Every structure is written in structure tokens, then in C-alpha cells.
């Protein structure tokens, strides 16, 4: 069992894992919303895929502290999800998503450490940078869920929100359009919290690629 865990960790510490994570994130960010809109099983797939992404974060670092934090957050997140979907009257929807945001932030930090752990610059590192970008979009969607659950309002326009996991379809769409500064205008923020989040995501969307590209170019130059 210990050897299996070591092999699993060795894979997630290698550059090849960036591609696997990219596939998972593309599924979560671009494919899953379509499935959730047309299928009754979309919510289950959303929760399984989200937890799978966070589970991989436990093995993506050699730092005992980060592994412990990631494992604790994953365990709490899993427990809260099971409570909500179990046959009981209890639900901690806001806390569940707050833990999800914390888990995403930790995973972003872990991936940035992997991305810049040495001076190697290759296609896998570019994929790693894309992964962080998509994780930022995921963080934005989870934050919108918290805002909507806490205030009762978040997005307006061509959208009907139900206050359930099905709203992820609209939240990830708005998060991505804000992050990429596309802003089609069909969906818009309706309260201050959502507006400031959209502004924050737009700022990240501009600064993150510039900073990462500059860093990768600097590493390539110093190596050569």
C-alpha cells in the first residue's frame, strides 16, 4: 500500500501530471456545464470530478505541511458533501463552498510551486500555467456560489438561479468571461460582492498571463 501511494505521488509530482490535470480541468470547466444542462446526472458528475481534482492535490507536493492541509480540507469537503447528499435534513452549503475555495487556493499554490520548482521550461510547464488559470476560474465560480447563498443574489440577466449545484453552469461561465475579460453582457453581476469579484477576476486575468510569461521567459534566458 505504501509503495502504491509513493508511485501515485511520484506521478503527480512529475511534469506529465500537468496534462492529466488539464484534462480534468477542461472537463470540469468546459464539458461538465453542458452535461449538467442536458442530463440529470450532471450534479453527481460535478461533485465527483471536483473532489477528484482536490484529491490529486494531496499528492502533488512533497511538503508535509501542504499535504496535511490539503488532506484535511479534502476530508472536510468530502464529509460536508456526503452530509448534504445523505438521507438527513442537514446541509452546510455555504461552509462546503468556503472549504472548496480554500482547497482551490491551496491547490493553486501547490501548482505554482510545481510550475517554478526549477529552471526547466517545456511544454508541460506551459500546460501547468494553463491549469492554474483554469483553477482561478473554478475558484471564481465557487466564490459566486457563496455570494449567492449568503446574500440571495449574485448574477442577473439571461439567467435563472436555483440556489443549487445546477447554478455552477452559470457561475463558471461568468467566472471565465470575467477572467478572460470577454464579458458578453448576457449575464452580469447585480450586487457589490459579485461586481468586485468580477473586477478581481478581470485583474487576475490580465496580470497572471503577463507575470507567468515573464517568469518563464526569465527562467529560459537564465538557463541558456
Q: Whereabouts are the PLM-identified features?
A:
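Outer-pore turret/helix-boundary of cation channels
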Residues: 36-38, 48, 139-173
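Structural signature of hydrophobic alpha-helical transmembrane segments
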Residues: 34-50, 93-105, 169-174
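Cytoplasmic-side transmembrane-helix entry/capping segments in multi-pass membrane proteins
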Residues: 65-76, 93-101, 121-132
Amino acid at each position: 500500500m505504501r509503495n502504491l501511494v509513493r508511485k501515485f505521488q511520484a506521478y503527480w509530482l512529475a511534469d506529465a501530471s500537468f496534462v492529466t490535470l488539464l484534462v480534468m480541468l477542461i472537463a470540469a470547466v468546459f464539458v461538465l456545464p453542458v452535461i449538467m444542462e442536458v442530463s440529470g446526472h450532471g450534479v453527481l458528475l460535478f461533485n465527483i470530478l471536483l473532489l477528484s481534482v482536490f484529491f490529486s492535490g494531496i499528492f502533488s507536493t512533497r511538503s508535509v505541511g501542504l499535504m496535511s492541509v490539503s488532506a484535511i480540507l479534502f476530508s472536510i469537503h468530502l464529509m460536508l458533501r456526503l452530509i448534504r447528499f445523505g438521507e438527513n435534513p442537514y446541509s452546510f452549503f455555504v461552509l462546503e463552498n468556503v472549504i472548496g475555495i480554500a482547497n482551490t487556493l491551496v491547490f493553486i499554490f501547490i501548482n505554482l510551486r510545481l510550475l517554478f520548482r526549477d529552471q526547466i521550461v517545456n511544454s508541460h510547464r506551459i500546460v501547468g500555467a494553463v491549469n492554474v488559470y483554469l483553477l482561478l476560474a473554478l475558484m471564481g465560480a465557487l466564490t459566486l456560489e457563496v455570494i449567492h447563498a449568503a446574500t440571495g443574489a449574485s448574477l442577473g440577466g439571461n439567467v435563472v438561479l436555483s440556489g443549487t449545484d445546477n447554478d455552477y453552469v452559470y457561475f463558471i461561465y461568468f467566472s471565465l468571461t470575467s477572467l478572460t475579460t470577454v464579458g458578453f453582457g448576457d449575464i452580469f453581476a447585480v450586487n457589490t460582492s459579485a461586481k468586485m469579484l468580477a473586477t478581481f477576476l478581470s485583474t487576475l486575468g490580465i496580470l497572471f498571463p503577463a507575470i507567468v510569461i515573464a517568469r518563464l521567459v526569465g527562467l529560459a534566458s537564465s538557463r541558456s
